[in-house]
């Protein structure tokens, strides 16, 4: 496994030099709705991506239709592979599994892999589950606990560093948490 730190432009040039074309993400399928799903869908639409959301809860679907009028909202169970096929999972550029159940998210992500979805992201609440599925073809496993812990750690470090005239803006954990990359705001 290789980890690279570079600007977006440098990464594009790097992959082009290797002959690996990085396709732009245009169609994103989000499975499951919560605060993160709404925020993500809003940001993706702002970036001119088409967003399709599948959600079990009818009331949430109605609310999303009002909040995200340009998104396609589907009332249904995203763990139903027939529904995913009907909704064109094979033509999605990315699938994001954000239900409240780790197992459902992992199953959807693995099914997306069989459908050759180029980018697959699944949210898990238990770090042990993230470790179990590593290497199974899911591009990104996002641990809710790790993201929260990183945000708190970043805040604490920013408060500590503010005395020394530099604030930590962003904290990234890489290589299974063995490496940290910090983005600082330096004041003159």
Feature map (PLM): residue ranges:
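Cytosolic regulatory regions of ion transport systems
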Residues: 1-188
């Amino acid at each position: 496994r290789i980890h690279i730190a570079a600007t977006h432009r440098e990464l594009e040039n790097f992959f082009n030099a290797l002959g690996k074309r990085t396709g732009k993400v245009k169609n994103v399928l989000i499975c499951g709705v919560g605060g993160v799903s709404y925020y993500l869908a809003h940001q993706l639409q702002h970036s001119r991506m088409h967003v399709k959301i599948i959600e079990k809860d009818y009331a949430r679907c109605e609310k999303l239709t009002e909040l995200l009028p340009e998104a396609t909202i589907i009332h249904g169970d995203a763990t139903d592979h027939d529904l995913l096929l009907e909704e064109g999972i094979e033509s999605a550029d990315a699938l994001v599994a954000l239900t409240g159940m780790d197992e459902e998210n992992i199953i959807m992500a693995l099914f997306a892999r069989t459908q050759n979805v180029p980018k697959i992201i699944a949210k898990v609440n238990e770090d042990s589950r993230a470790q179990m599925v590593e290497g199974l073809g899911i591009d990104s496993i996002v641990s809710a606990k790790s993201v929260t812990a990183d945000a708190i750690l970043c805040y604490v470090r920013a408060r500590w560093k503010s005395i020394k005239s530099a604030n930590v803006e962003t904290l990234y954990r890489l290589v299974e948490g063995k490496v940290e990359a910090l983005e600082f705001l330096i004041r003159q």
